[in-house]
């Protein structure tokens, strides 16, 4: 990553590989105040299978209907809005120039057949990611906490 228009190559897999009870943690840094998808998306042509949309002042949800109704956390703190966190709330929480661990709990990715990061049309991330973890929602709390701490430490955070 050089911090400009970087993305992750799309990973492809069979539908059903992921479940309707998935959690995702991403160490992410926005280097500009521009709107961006800071989470994952299945395809840039499917506006519903996306999560982590950060858009200044927007009252729309930060998770598309094709990704379930997860709760959203930044640096271990749940964002206001429950399972309906807005794009504006996420945009504010992910401060520019700093790494954060962005977390989604309770994603439904059971129909996804691919995933990508950073290059979502019109919402390209100008920044970097320091790691992505995707795991079952049933993961014990102690393991989830250890994963968050490890991911944060990779990018210089103490969580």
Language model features with spans:
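Extracellular glycan-recognition modules
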Residues: 1-71, 110-112, 137-148
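Short, aromatic/His-centered strand-loop micro-motif at the edge of beta-sheets
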Residues: 11-12, 65-98
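Extracellular/lumenal carbohydrate-interaction signature centered on repeated Trp-anchored short motifs
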Residues: 12-24, 33, 90-100, 122-128
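A structural signal for beta-strand register positions
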Residues: 27, 101-106, 133
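Short, hydrophobic beta-strand segments that form beta-sheet elements in well-ordered domains
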Residues: 62-65, 100-105, 118-120
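Extracellular glycan-interaction patches encoded by glycine-rich segments
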Residues: 107-130, 138-139
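Extended recognition patches within non-cytosolic domains
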Residues: 131-159
């Amino acid at each position: 990553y050089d911090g400009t228009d970087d993305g992750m190559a799309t990973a492809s897999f069979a539908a059903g590989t992921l479940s309707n009870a998935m959690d995702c943690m991403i160490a992410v840094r926005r280097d500009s105040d521009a709107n961006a998808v800071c989470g994952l998306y299945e395809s840039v042509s499917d506006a519903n299978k996306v999560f982590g949309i950060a858009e200044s002042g927007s009252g729309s949800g930060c998770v598309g209907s094709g990704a379930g109704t997860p709760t959203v956390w930044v640096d271990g703190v749940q964002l206001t809005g429950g399972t309906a966190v807005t794009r504006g709330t996420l945009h504010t929480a992910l401060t520019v120039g700093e790494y954060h661990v962005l977390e989604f709990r309770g994603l439904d990715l059971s129909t996804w057949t691919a995933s990508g990061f950073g290059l979502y049309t019109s919402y390209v991330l100008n920044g970097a990611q320091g790691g992505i973890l995707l795991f079952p929602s049933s993961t014990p709390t102690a393991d989830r906490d250890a994963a968050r701490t490890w991911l944060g430490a990779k990018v210089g955070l103490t969580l």
